[in-house]
Amino acid sequence: MTDSLSPEAVEPRLRGRFGRPYEYVASTASTQLLLPPEAPEGALVAADEQTAGRGRLGRRWLAPAGTSLLCSLQLRPAVESERLPELTGVAALACLEAIAALTGLEPVLKFPNDVLVGERKVAGVLAEAREERVVLGIGVNVNVPADELPQEVDRAATSLLVETGRELDRAALLAALLERLERRYDAWLSGAR
């Protein structure tokens, strides 16, 4: 199976406005640093590797190159600032739904930002408010072999490969995630919970 996050692999699968424009980089310190303030809502950057990826509360996000879905999405929600923390849960639920749809697994949400399979973390979400925008970072352990899961958290982390026994197409997962996230985001903007 060819597993790529290249524009050629991702863009034909996009159905909505999220992921447009789409930028891919092979390696970066963190995708959270790559979206400029002037980027439009829906702009997305994805990478095969993050050398300084981080999660909520400054925790490190570690993943071998080419095995995970690592991306950041620009949002410009016109809502009260008090509602912005809700975006973390909106994105985590969309991630959970995409994983379930593509794998048949039954992931659960560990409030506010982690997606678990069993008792082990498979994905995380980080929402950072910056001026008039929110940069939403999402990391999913997709094709990480069991022996390459980070040693310091090997009892707490898993991957979709470990849980399903098969490699998954990261571009398909990204497209499924963006479709669900756009739908949930629009409902959230309109006041639905």
Predicted regions and their residues:
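Residues at or immediately flanking beta-strands
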Residues: 21, 106-108
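Short loop/edge segments at beta-strand edges and connector loops
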Residues: 26, 109-111
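N-terminal lobe of the biotin/lipoate ligase/transferase fold
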Residues: 1-101, 186
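Long, positively charged amphipathic alpha-helical accessory segments at protein N-termini or as interdomain linkers
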Residues: 2, 81-106, 117-193
